[in-house]
Amino acid sequence: MSTGSAHVQMVIITGMSGAGKTVAIQSFEDLGYFCVDNLPPTLLPKFLELIRESGNKMNKIALVMDLRSRDFFDRLFVALDDLAETSWVTPKILFLDANDATLVSRYKETRRSHPLAPSGLPLEGINLERQLLEELKGRAQMIIDTSNLKPRELREKIVQTFATPTTTTFSVNVVSFGFKYGLPIDADLVFDVRFLPNPHYIEHMRPKTGLDEEVSSYVLKWTETQKFIEKVTDLLSFMLPHYKREGKSQVVIAIGCTGGQHRSVTLAEYIGRYFADEYTTHVSHRDIAKRKDTHR
């Protein structure tokens, strides 16, 4: 076992059922944490052993531990005490809470039963759970009351609290494609550039792509291309901050022409460069390797 392991930040997410633990674990995943949902406390020592033996390649971990684990109260405090004696792990407990009326309302909306009152009234289970979790809540380093928080607001609060300056929380993925091969199924925004002048009709450019300077210069020189770039970058400059504020971890922007060789490739490269200073950007060309004698 390595003795020179890197330090591990661990967040244990717990709290009242229905208070937002699912949103919380998704938020930590967006922050680059290695996440495990419903880890039984008895498995925590073995889990940490595996992390350490791996050389701590996962140095940020978020775990959901709650009443779904049958041995929750028997083993959790023992595991927490053991963690306190571990020099290479810094554990923090994030406790999510909400008032009774909010929790009852959420259970009614989802039509789910409370885990401690599967055949009874939700409030009975809530009251019992609140009593059982009282000591654990007292040991929490951070408590968030989600009674008046929308999922997006809870996500924002977690990101603001746990994000580091080097954490990548939002990325812009730009992909070129050919309409003849179908739309990218993961696209959030699709722009059709088939109205732009087509290098396919210039014989010596036909075998080239938008990655070639001659082709990109040809596509970009037209007034309609410049107008398109002006309008699209202005639109995206407005939209992207709002996507980020809503808690999205990435936005996929698809630029399409007929075959995905010339115009879409040129514009995808341009838009990727345009936003590279402000966001983490990735540019890919889905259909650039598909070469058939067709309009590009």
Swiss-Prot record:
Lineage: Bacteria, Bacillati, Bacillota, Bacilli, Bacillales
Ligand binding (ATP): 15-22
Coiled-coil region(s): none
Keywords, ordered alphabetically: ATP-binding, GTP-binding, Nucleotide-binding
MF-aspect GO terms: ATP binding; GTP binding
Nucleotide-binding recorded as keyword: yes
Amino acids binding GTP: 66-69
Protein's name according to its UniProt entry: Nucleotide-binding protein Aflv_2526
Stored Pfam families: PapZ_C, RapZ-like_N
InterPro entries from the UniProt entry: P-loop_NTPase, RapZ-like, RapZ-like_N, RapZ_C
UniProt keyword annotation of ATP-binding present: yes
Family stated for the protein in its record: Belongs to the RapZ-like family.
Described function: Displays ATPase and GTPase activities.
